[in-house]
């Protein structure tokens, strides 16, 4: 059996009860934290809290050389962990399909994701979001500015009146995390100076949610990572009220969105 378990967003307690039970019953536990990580828990914290040993895999060890994971899963109960949800954004469908091809039973125990948390924290309605994008560090995509794939997706969403979640690049092996202020500065240069919402530490006891024009967000300090940005499309009146109450959105910026 190969069980995919989402750990949620914040610490060793963010996992669901079903996930915790499956984790503690596993004979072997593997995890990856190269695409996301828990804001307030180390691997050691997870191991201590759940009385387990975790084999942390790099990207190559998951995507190119998962044979030992699959071999173990043919005769043992194996758990595979990620922050958030293993099948949303950080998708491991390929690993699941490889297991199924070998006749291995699989299941998924879901965790809270950054996108659902961002919707809840901002008050923006979940069904009004379009395609999400990831904004890389400039050095990571080998060119100046924002990749056209990012700006094109944002523009396409806005044409349809949809909101965009902008995930921010993570280089966990280098302890580098793109911050909302730096991302806002990059986007303000390549896009119009539009309304945006910075969300920091979603899932924690002290998340930060602030709405303003991109140039204003670029001047703010949102504290420790992880951060993301939301670029709103057309706003329902309840969404406007939520952004004003939950994210201190300036009234003139909400009016500007209405007039687009």
Curated annotation (Swiss-Prot):
InterPro entries: 4pyrrol_Mease (IPR000878), 4pyrrol_Methylase_sf (IPR035996), 4pyrrole_Mease_sub1 (IPR014777), 4pyrrole_Mease_sub2 (IPR014776), Dphthn_synthase (IPR004551). Pathway: Protein modification; peptidyl-diphthamide biosynthesis. The gene is dphB. GO terms for molecular function: diphthine synthase activity. It is an enzyme of class 2 (transferase). S-adenosyl-L-methionine-dependent methyltransferase that catalyzes the trimethylation of the amino group of the modified target histidine residue in translation elongation factor 2 (EF-2), to form an intermediate called diphthine. The three successive methylation reactions represent the second step of diphthamide biosynthesis. Belongs to the diphthine synthase family. SUPFAM superfamilies: Tetrapyrrole methylase. The keyword Hydrolase does not apply. It comes from the Archaea. This is Diphthine synthase. It comes from Haloquadratum walsbyi (strain DSM 16790 / HBSQ001). The keyword Magnesium does not apply. Keywords: Methyltransferase, S-adenosyl-L-methionine, Transferase. It catalyses: 2-[(3S)-amino-3-carboxypropyl]-L-histidyl-[translation elongation factor 2] + 3 S-adenosyl-L-methionine = diphthine-[translation elongation factor 2] + 3 S-adenosyl-L-homocysteine + 3 H(+). S-adenosyl-L-methionine binds at residues 9, 85, 88, 113-114, 168, 202, 227. One of its GO terms (biological process) is protein histidyl modification to diphthamide. Pfam families: TP_methylase. Its EC number is 2.1.1.98.
């Amino acid at each position: 059996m190969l069980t995919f378990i989402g750990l949620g967003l914040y610490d060793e307690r963010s996992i669901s009860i079903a996930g915790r039970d499956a984790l503690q019953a596993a004979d072997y536990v593997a995890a990856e934290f190269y695409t996301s990580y828990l804001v307030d828990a180390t691997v050691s914290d997870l191991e201590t809290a759940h009385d387990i040993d975790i084999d942390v895999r790099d990207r190559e060890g998951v995507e190119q050389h998962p044979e030992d994971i699959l071999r173990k899963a043919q005769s043992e109960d194996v758990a595979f962990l990620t922050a958030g949800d293993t099948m949303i954004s950080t998708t491991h469908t390929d690993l699941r399909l490889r297991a199924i091809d070998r006749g291995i039973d699989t299941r998924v125990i879901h965790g809270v994701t950054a996108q659902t948390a961002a919707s809840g924290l901002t008050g923006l309605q979940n069904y009004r979001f379009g395609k999400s994008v990831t904004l890389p560090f400039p050095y990571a995509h080998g060119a100046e500015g924002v990749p056209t794939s990012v700006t094109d997706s944002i523009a396409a969403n806005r044409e349809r009146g949809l909101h965009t979640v902008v995930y921010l690049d993570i280089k966990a092996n280098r302890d580098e995390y793109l911050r909302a202020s730096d991302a806002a500065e990059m986007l303000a240069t390549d896009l119009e100076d539009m309304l945006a919402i910075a969300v920091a530490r979603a899932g924690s006891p002290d998340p930060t949610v602030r709405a303003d024009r991109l140039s204003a967000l670029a001047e703010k300090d949102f504290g420790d990572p992880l951060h993301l940005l939301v670029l709103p499309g057309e706003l329902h009146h309840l969404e406007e009220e939520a952004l004003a109450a939950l994210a201190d959105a300036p009234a003139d910026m909400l009016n500007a969105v209405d007039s687009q």
